Structure formats: structure tokens, C-alpha cells
Amino acid sequence: MSQANAATKASSDVFFNASLEDIDPEIFGAIRNELGRQRHEIELIASENIVSRAVLEAQGSILTNKYAEGYPGKRYYGGCQYVDVVEELAIERAKKLFSAEFANVQPNSGSQMNQAVFLALLQPGDTFMGLDLNSGGHLTHGSPVNMSGKWFNVVSYGVRKDDHLLDMDEVARLARENKPKLILAGGTAYSRIWDWKRFREIADEVGAYLMVDMAHIAGLVAGGQHPSPVPHAHVCTTTTHKSLRGPRGGMILTNDADIAKKINSAVFPGLQGGPLMHVIAGKAVAFAEALKLEFKLYAKNVVDNARALAEELKSHGLDIVSGGTDNHLMLVDLRPKNATGKRAEAALGRANITCNKNGIPFDPEKPFVTSGVRLGTPAGTTRGFGVAEFKEIGSLIAEVLDGLKVANSDEGNAAVEQAVKEKVIALTGRFPMYGYQG
């Protein structure tokens, strides 16, 4: 073997066999530190969850090497016979999980799945209705700073001021007045049951499509803990992470063959090129997990835990927007503790409790300050926390917020936060992740 060939072989051996730690210790270190953070902190961000080792393996597989523009059996590249199997499994499992006739599993994100529906069913300048961001909607539901708010005429609906519940009579009135081409239901910070049947009746009355973004509650729908929108909506979108407990990505479901064709064309070639086959593999694995009986128990536990957490927080003098929760999340009004979302998020973070500041309906504070925090139970429930643990977590949150109220500063109460942090580390130590003890 020549010297040049030997050098090439040595380089190839390193390329295919050296570890991440050997090749890039900086990235390895950041990942290791993130794993430590996840192990030792309580994750209460409602849109986050923890995937199984099987999902991690699928997403970290050699499928990341394969380009596969198009759809199974109709690719623009050769060598797709095995990724076709992967995508077909993901599609069939998604259809079974949600009792849908058609599924597109290629959207790379929640934003892109919603963009694909707009591209399929609307023209720039068309009118659509969506839940106002300040009432628990999403940026892609018509926020002025988002493409959805820039390209279309958006009519936003919201919640009532007295009870923070959706006012369906107001939704109907706005629909009759504005004649939208599409009505979008679903949100990111609404803790009550959605009346899909009523939304469809309103949509039919004005000749609009009904689109449901069930990204936050898809796992609860799959687990039988929230009514399914699929029988009522013309088209449903959902992310595949959050309560569904899969990899980060999107999916579109429909029972209408004509809409399905438009959706497929909108996703590819309209919006995306090659799909992320390693992510689609992770989606397929997560769907298989969600089809198991254990997932129904998981979904029930998510809701039970959320209700327990909400009641515990209320017992410590905190207000829960709308008075409680029917799903996996809650908005906590911090004004009884004279705290802002910004201060509370930082103080809880120092105590190893992760959440996000969030505006509440009719919030007097600025979006980067807010009067509330959003809390969710999917990740903690995945970890094994039950009602007892979430009651303890509620007490720990109140402890930090009471300390923050006394301190009345951005720095918080270091002694209280350190004491709570030690309790959090002890709690998380009883529920190890990925086989790790300690």
C-alpha cells in the first residue's frame, strides 16, 4: 500500500470510527452538560418532553445520510427503498393513531406544517381567523410579526375577560361578519377543552375550512384524554414532540382526499425539499410507542398531574388562568405574589425548576416581562413523577416565589433558592434518566 493510500485509509478509519468526544470535545462537552441539566432539573416547559432511547437511536441513525425528495414510491433519487419503508410505517402508524385517512409526516417543524396548510388552502390576502397570541394562540396563527400575519388578512378571536374561556358566540359573530376562508382552532396556552364540533358548525355556516392545530394536545388526543378534532376538522396539524413524546417535527392529517393532494404538493415541492428521514424514523418509533396501552396511562397521568399541580399552587395563594386546567398545562398569574414572569422564570431556574414566562390574557406587562408563567407536566410525567411529586413541586415553586416576593429584586432570595435547588436535586435523583443513577 502506498504512503498516500495508507494515509487515506487512516483518515477514513478515523472518520468512521472516532467518537464525538475525540473529534469535537467542545460540542461533546456542551451535550454532556445539557444531559446533566436535564437530569438534575425539573422540566416544566409545557412544550418540552423527553424522548425514549429508541427514538434517540432512530434519530441518530445513518438515515441522516439519505436524500429522499418526493414521497414513497415517487422519489427523485435512487436508493430509497429502505427509507420508503420508514416513511410508510410512519404514515400508517400516524393514521392508525389518530383514525385519519391521510397523513403527511414530512414537515420539519410546527411552523412549516401550518405554512404548508396555508399554502395549500389560501391565497395571499385571504382572510382567516385564529386565536389571539395574548389569549393563548401561536405566532403562526396570525401574529403581525409572523408570515401568517403579514401575508393574510387575520381576524383574531380571544377569551372572555371575566373567566378567560373561549367565547364561542363571539367566534361565530366574527365569522359571520368577516366571512373567513379558514378558521384555525387550537393554541399554545389554553388549558381547557376545545369544542371542535361547535367550531365546525361555525365554519360550515360561513363556508370556511376548519383547521385545527393540536400541537400541544396531540398526545392527550392519542391517549384518549381530550376529544379528537380529526372527525370535525378539514385538516389537522400537530408537532410530533410535546405531549406526543416524539422527535421535534410536524405532521398534517386529513380525511379529505382532495385536501390531502393539495397538502402533499404544498409540503413538497411547495415548501420543503428533501425530508429529514432520520427524524421521520424517530416519528415512526414515537407513533408505535403511542399506540401501546401504556401511553393511554401516560396521557391520563399527565392530566391528573397537571390538575394536582394547579390545585397545589392555588392553595399557596396563586391564581390559575381560567381557574384550572383540563389538559397538560396551566398559566399561573403571578400578581398575587407581586412577581413578574421574567423574575419568576429566572428565580425558578436558579432553583433548578425550568419554565417559561408567558403573557396572561389582558396582561398589563410587556411581552418580555409578563405577569405569568406557563407550566406543563408532560416531561415530569415521562420521568415518572406522580401526583405526590407534583404536589411537592407546587410547594417548591411557591417557596421560591414567596422568597422572591420578600427579596423584591431581580436577584431573588439566594438562601431560599439554594434550599429548593437541593430539594429538587434530591427529587430528580429518585427518577433517573437513560439508566443514569445519581
From Swiss-Prot:
Belongs to the SHMT family. One of its GO terms (cellular component) is cytosol. Signal peptide: none annotated. Keywords: Amino-acid biosynthesis, Cytoplasm, One-carbon metabolism, Pyridoxal phosphate, Transferase. It catalyses: (6R)-5,10-methylene-5,6,7,8-tetrahydrofolate + glycine + H2O = (6S)-5,6,7,8-tetrahydrofolate + L-serine. The lineage of its organism: Bacteria, Pseudomonadati, Pseudomonadota, Alphaproteobacteria, Hyphomicrobiales. HAMAP family: SHMT. The record marks 241 as: Plays an important role in substrate specificity. The modification N6-(pyridoxal phosphate)lysine is found at residue 242. It holds the Pfam family SHMT. Its cofactor is pyridoxal 5'-phosphate. Pathway: One-carbon metabolism; tetrahydrofolate interconversion; Amino-acid biosynthesis; glycine biosynthesis; glycine from L-serine: step 1/1. GO terms for molecular function: glycine hydroxymethyltransferase activity; pyridoxal phosphate binding. This is Serine hydroxymethyltransferase. Homodimer. (6S)-5,6,7,8-tetrahydrofolate binds at residues 133, 137-139. It is found in: Cytoplasm.
